[in-house]
């Protein structure tokens, strides 16, 4: 863990006034991992950096593309073709030069999951759309008491006011998370009792998905990692809000630690 402690200053004074000096010190020492830094994850990273989180590990193998412009923070003309984790590291350096950023240009797989998460993080945000890998991560995190939150699908939605957080057992309206719930119960032995929490916190929306005006929606288990929303239409009004909900969960968890 990074031992640097930020004292309240012009840069993060507003955070100290809101959360308190002790919480700001905890933020500066915290290490948060974001898996998938696309339409949801990139905005989560921005929020964490602007809240004074002292160390960030970013995991993604994708590059910034022109088709990302409608929903991803780092999708700027000058950054097309650049690794997403690199584009974000460069941006974070302008926000908080003291923030340590580790770039991992890779996708999480069932083979490398244990290696990537062997070290404990203060919090992990999952913002990928591959069900099999989301399930493997969720099962691993629950087993190892790793604090985390999963993002549901953010494509095909227009109203950020309908976003909420809940345990996976309580999630509705989200095909990605419904598939995840089924997979965890079938492959990893999670309880099928609908009254019992699964200990898998999620961000999701109760909005009914709007199907594409043309083309076909992508399969959530065959698309590249990162909540690409490539098949559904997508707006940053929603994808960014999902990311901010994820970041809020991380910040509140870290602020509440003693």
Q: What annotation goes with each model-predicted range?
A:
Residues 1-33, 66:
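N-terminal charged helix/coil linker that caps or initiates catalytic domains
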Residues 2-6, 119-123, 128-133, 143, ...:
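Glycine-rich phosphate/adenylate-binding loop
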Residues 34-36, 59:
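Conserved N-terminal Rossmann-fold NAD(P)-binding element of oxidoreductases
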Residues 40:
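Hydrophobic/small residue at the entry helix of a nucleotide-binding pocket
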Residues 55-96:
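Glycine-rich phosphate-binding loop and adjoining beta1-alpha1-beta2 segment
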Residues 104-113:
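Conserved SAM/SAH-binding loop
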């Amino acid at each position: 863990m990074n031992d640097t402690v930020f004292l309240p200053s012009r840069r993060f004074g507003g955070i100290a006034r809101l959360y308190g000096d002790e919480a700001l010190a905890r933020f500066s020492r915290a290490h948060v991992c974001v898996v998938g830094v696309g339409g949801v994850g990139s905005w989560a990273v921005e929020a964490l950096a602007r809240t004074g989180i002292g160390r960030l590990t970013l995991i993604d193998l994708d590059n910034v593309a022109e088709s990302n412009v409608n929903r991803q923070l780092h999708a700027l003309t000058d950054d097309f073709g650049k690794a997403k984790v690199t584009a974000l590291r460069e941006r974070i350096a302008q926000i908080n030069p003291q923030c340590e950023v580790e770039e991992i240009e890779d996708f999480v797989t069932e083979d490398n999951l244990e290696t990537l998460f062997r070290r404990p993080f203060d919090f992990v945000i999952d913002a990928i759309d591959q069900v099999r890998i989301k399930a493997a991560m969720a099962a691993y995190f629950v087993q190892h008491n790793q604090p985390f939150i999963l993002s549901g699908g953010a494509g095909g939605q227009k109203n950020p006011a309908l976003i909420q957080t809940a345990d996976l057992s309580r999630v509705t309206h989200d095909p990605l998370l419904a598939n995840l719930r089924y997979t965890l119960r079938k492959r990893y032995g999670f309880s099928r009792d609908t009254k019992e929490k699964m200990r898998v916190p999620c961000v999701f929306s109760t909005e009914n998905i709007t199907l594409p005006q043309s083309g076909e929606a992508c399969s959530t288990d065959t698309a590249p990692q990162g909540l690409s929303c490539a098949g559904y239409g997508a707006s940053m009004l929603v994808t960014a809000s999902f990311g901010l909900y994820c970041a809020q969960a991380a910040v509140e968890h870290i602020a509440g630690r003693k």
